[in-house]
Amino acid sequence: MKGQKGIEVTERPNAGLHWFAIFVAFLTVVLLLAGALVTSNEAGDSVPDWPLSFGRWLISSDNFIANVRYEYSHRFIAGMVGVATFALALWMWFSERRAWVRWLALIAFLGVVLQAVIGGVRVHFPAYKPLIAVPHALIAQSFFGVIVSLAVFTSKSWWRQRDRKPDAGGLPLRTLTTLSVAAVLVQLVLGAAFRHGASGITPHAAGAVIVTAIVAWTAIATLRRHSGDAYLIRPAKLLLVLLTAQVSLGVMAYLARMSSAGYPVSGVGEFFDSMSLAPLAQPNQVQPLEPMISLTAGHLIVGALTLATILVLTLRAYRALQPGRERAAEVSGGGTLASPRKAAI
């Protein structure tokens, strides 16, 4: 059948496609973790060539030692994500009837290709590490967001949610969630800039306060306005849990870095001494050991999961709630705020 504005509507969602999208999202989380371990262990320069590794696609066990383990594992998992994303895009292109979803899947594939190329450039131009590593991190998180979106768009709950209800009270939830997504993305960039030596701790720490306030406001507003709607409150509750964990991990990572042997550490420079915005990388200093590595890697992963959760809440808010202009029109026209609106597929 045809949906609003002539959009083709498939009444039966493809469960296999949905679960495969979730699988690709899971692989991406593993890839993000592998990348975090590469950064924390200063392993990015351990393999000097790209796309090959020591001139080979598969390295020998003799080479799979020390920091090479982290960098090569990162590349191997990235290859798996690339193949899986290609399969997902191909599957969606031939089975998904919504053109915009097909194009989004294609964008995901192009994104993972671009990410691989930027990673290769980073290997061949180590002197420009901060300049290249920060967009590399941003594209990684953005790619993850696109995959999560594809999983949402192919879910049963997305298809079942056909009526839009009013969003009474305060700033529209659509606006709040969109603002939260943007804030989290900016904060992830600031975190990447700090980890890769492109800036000091001050922007990331200040951003953490602002982002925490915005995301908490969004989650609490959702729980207050839509307490009986599981479609919205489930991601909102999870968001509060992740936000608490993220702040806790951030504080613990800060304290662990301050007390690490060899502080200040390589790859980030004397940030805590100067609180400067200028990159002051000290490549000859000692990389911190546990628990510093685990805390920073966990902080990155929980940040990615926070982005995914707020993105899910945002998409669901756009799916389930009327936009502000519809609410205003109903009030000015004497209509009732209880009247539903059909959601486009």
Regions found by a protein language model. Give the residues of each.
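Polytopic transmembrane helical bundles with strong interfacial aromatic enrichment
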Residues: 2-345
